[in-house]
UniProtKB/Swiss-Prot annotation:
Glycans are attached at residues 119, 379. This is AA13 family lytic polysaccharide monooxygenase A. InterPro entries: Carb-bd-like_fold, CBM20, CBM20_glucoamylase, Cellulose/chitin-bd_N, Ig-like_fold, Starch-active_LPMO. Belongs to the polysaccharide monooxygenase AA13 family. Its cofactor is Cu(2+). It catalyses: starch + reduced acceptor + O2 = D-glucono-1,5-lactone-terminated malto-oligosaccharides + short-chain malto-oligosaccharides + acceptor + H2O. The lineage of its organism: Eukaryota, Fungi, Dikarya, Ascomycota, Pezizomycotina. Cu(2+) binds at residues 18, 108, 241. It comes from Aspergillus terreus (strain NIH 2624 / FGSC A1156). O-mannosylated. The gene is LPMO13A. Its main location: secreted.
Length: 400
């Protein structure tokens, strides 16, 4: 028995550094930014079967939102700093950019996925202040998130390859999940190779982070408050990483409409992170969904860019449509640093764009001497959602 215990302890301590969801802001990220979580990349479900069967592992105490044993924080229940309100509002059918951060010392390769559970009654158990879901409820929710998988192939034009560390015919041979590159590749290896971003393009506490960016399509569903679940299955180790972000979905075009009824008030701390969009509602009380009588011709799209800048540098967005200057740096739209802090380098601007428009864009930095610094390739792509009057959207990203 003693040997068994020592072996398990060794499994928990042998490998340092891992990954966590950053855009939209996960509960883990908010815990990190408020100082509660000292290692956001360390919420780990282990030891479990993570490969080649991606769905075999039971989530146990980790649940769909993660448990960090290092700091004894269970992200499956709201706290003062997360879980009381959405951090961003998406629109049904919208294609959005999502991002996670992998630590340089714990890039285990493998595959990852996102999901939205459309059983609001079940999700509400993870939104109720003071209530910790049971392990059975946690597993039921994870099963629901797997059923509500947001497939790579749902986004038109997105490259959805097979994992090079998987063998054809094995359970991991699938391209509905997103894949990292070959674990032992000489260049652009593993998960850090997906973006090819520079070290410290996102923040971890062990060895510095690399961004991993993809696009997902929001389902035909609406909710004042629900969860986006991120899951990464490691190829190298017997580990799974689970994280949740509190989101809202507006403007369902015909899918099930369900509203949270778990609480009528929200608690907001003055030290709460300012890096995320304000919610569109201040209460999660049940309300009737209005019938859409007027389709919006213009949608306010908020561009959020997380980029560290020097004094005198300014950030702009430009792109393939006239509203973004048609790639002219002279006509690029300036972002505001009103919410910028050293730990949360956020630049934002909101632009009214024609509903349904698809375009490419990039962020640029203008130096004090007038020189221009462009983000690395490839161009970003975005499709403005369609919806009722009052629909808004957010395009969030980190500099690359």
């Amino acid at each position: 028995m003693l040997l068994t215990v020592l072996a398990v302890v060794g499994c928990f301590t042998a490998v340092n550094g891992h990954g966590y969801l950053t855009i939209p802001a996960s509960r883990t990220r908010l815990g990190f930014e408020t100082g509660i979580d000292t290692c956001p990349e360390c919420s780990i479900l282990e030891p479990v079967t993570a490969w080649p069967d991606l769905e075999a592992a039971q989530v146990g105490r980790s649940g769909p939102c993660g448990y960090n044993a290092r700091v004894s924080v269970d992200y499956n229940q709201p706290s003062e700093y997360w879980g009381n309100e959405p951090v961003v509002t998406y629109t049904s059918g919208e294609v959005v950019e999502v991002q996670w951060c992998v630590d340089a010392n714990g890039d285990h390769g493998g595959m990852f996925t996102y999901g939205i559970c459309q059983n609001q009654t079940l999700v509400d158990k993870f939104l109720t202040p003071g209530y910790l879901p049971t392990n059975e409820e946690k597993q039921a929710a994870e099963d629901c998130f797997l059923d509500g998988e947001l497939k790579c192939k749902d986004v038109s034009g997105q490259t959805c390859g097979y994992n090079p560390d998987c063998t054809e015919g094995a359970a991991c041979w699938r391209n509905d999940w997103f894949t990292c590159n070959a674990f032992q590749a000489n260049t652009a290896r593993a998960c850090q190779g997906v973006d090819g971003a520079s070290l410290n393009s996102c923040k971890t506490t062990i060895a510095g982070g690399y961004t991993v960016t993809k696009r997902i399509k929001i389902p035909d569903y609406s909710s004042d408050h629900t969860l986006l679940r991120f899951r990464w299955n490691s190829f190298q180790t017997a580990q799974v990483y689970l994280h949740c972000a509190d989101i809202a979905i507006a403007g369902s075009g015909g899918g099930t409409t369900s509203k949270s009824t778990t609480s009528t008030t929200s608690t907001t701390s003055t030290s709460r992170s300012t890096s995320t969009s304000a919610p569109t509602t201040t209460s999660s009380a049940s309300t009737a969904t209005p019938i859409c009588t007027t389709q919006a011709s213009l949608i306010p799209v908020t561009f959020q860019e997380f980029v560290t800048t020097m004094w005198g540098e300014n950030v702009f967005v430009t792109g393939s449509i006239s509203q973004l200057g048609s790639w002219s740096t002279d006509k690029a739209v300036a972002l505001s640093a009103t919410g910028y802090t050293a730990s949360n380098p956020l630049w934002t601007t909101t632009i009214d764009l024609p509903a349904g428009t698809t375009f490419e864009y990039k962020f640029i930095k203008k130096e004090t001497d007038g020189s221009i610094i462009w983000e690395s390739d490839p161009n970003r792509s975005y499709t403005v959602p369609t919806g009722c009057s009052g629909t808004t959207a957010t395009a969030a990203a980190s500099w690359r």
